[in-house]
């Protein structure tokens, strides 16, 4: 019998509901429960796949090929579970489903309304995402008071009434600001946020109060009094310098005990030794390296959330602090590659569109010529191929058809047909819709014996997640192989190139897939660990 924990937020956005939910999930998992996690996003987009990274941050890709909110990345990194498209629903997706049902006549000619049709669809989606787990944590995006969130809040209010207090609880995340001029913390924003939530019909059982410093006991009692929440259920969550400390912070305050008691669960004690080891490794590094990340979304580092975390995970594995130097690829186009001087490795991540692509090509050339370790991901592989074709293989004018309609040498082109892991053929053209029309999700990749990729992974076949429309053009395979480029990873049908290497380089590897989506703080990822070790060796 699944029990539900609904997590809402108030006062301001970006309080860290996703990390709080994921931290609670990993504590409950450590106490022997199976845990599922779902994010409900109020925006009307069907998914974030076509949203600008500056608007939304990273698009996180699941094993089954869903383009989802970046919070699902936090869920997978904290909780040992695999997310699917059933773990992220948007207003657009909910309405799309309801409208399809109306067109099929499933509502028997009735008037389709927010209540009950939209709220029923939300409840059905929540139950589907729960997947019969012992505990289902449901995060409601946005802030209480937003008009977009109202259908979701109404749906969870109804579920609370239907399930009863023994099977669900409500946890509300708020901000308790410190006013420097007054020298005191202010509880009024939290009081008003809970008042707004109660006006909808939801009484929170637990308050998690974000604060920059310790909340005095007197203020906690005041919050409890005005919000009708038990004093012990007013939990402080102070700012920390490392998000992987949060599970221990919440556990020390007994959040998991409060949850277990309110849901009528008797559980064994939690062991958080894994997280203690993670934090200890990050706080006591044996050295440090600096890695240049050359992209065009560097003003908003959330656009590279999983990459940032993957490099930190590799730092945990190697016991080195990884300093990331963000470099705007357009800056390299304007001012040259001086910004790369002194780095221990270069990473070029994925991206879309022509802006800044020549700067990424310059970064790949810099790494190749100066023997600096290089890791290219998705577009980072494509620019490495373009650079090699132009400057080593002598294919003047080599480019991708994504950026130039008719290049002299289209070494990268649109994938018009490929086979999915289920054996079905996907076809696309330049006129296809942008949303959901890429090669998406986990796909097997066969690695060549004796290659760097095979050495790094330690096996012949790996499975990694993809998100791209363009691929290497196999017509140029022989020419580039003759020039010294090695193609060391292939799709399972050997039609698509997945990994390229430069054998005469100390460490140069580029992949079409996104390994950052499967890296976790406790287990890391072999590709990032090997990349950071190469950076350490280069640093000397």
Curated annotation (Swiss-Prot):
Gene: pyrG
Subunit: Homotetramer.
The organism of origin for this protein: Alkalilimnicola ehrlichii (strain ATCC BAA-1101 / DSM 17681 / MLHE-1)
GO biological processes: 'de novo' CTP biosynthetic process; pyrimidine nucleobase biosynthetic process
Protein name: CTP synthase
Annotated catalytic residues: 378 (nucleophile), 514, 516
Top-level taxonomic group: Bacteria
Family (UniProt): Belongs to the CTP synthase family.
Associated pathway: Pyrimidine metabolism; CTP biosynthesis via de novo pathway; CTP from UDP: step 2/2
Role: Catalyzes the ATP-dependent amination of UTP to CTP with either L-glutamine or ammonia as the source of nitrogen. Regulates intracellular CTP levels through interactions with the four ribonucleotide triphosphates.
The keyword NAD belongs to this UniProt entry's keyword annotation: no
Entry binding sites for Mg(2+): 71, 139
Key words of the record: ATP-binding, Glutamine amidotransferase, Ligase, Magnesium, Metal-binding, Nucleotide-binding, Pyrimidine biosynthesis
Amino-acid positions noted as binding L-glutamine in the UniProt annotation, renumbered to this chain: 351, 379-382, 402, 469
Listed Pfam families: CTP_synth_N (PF06418), GATase (PF00117)
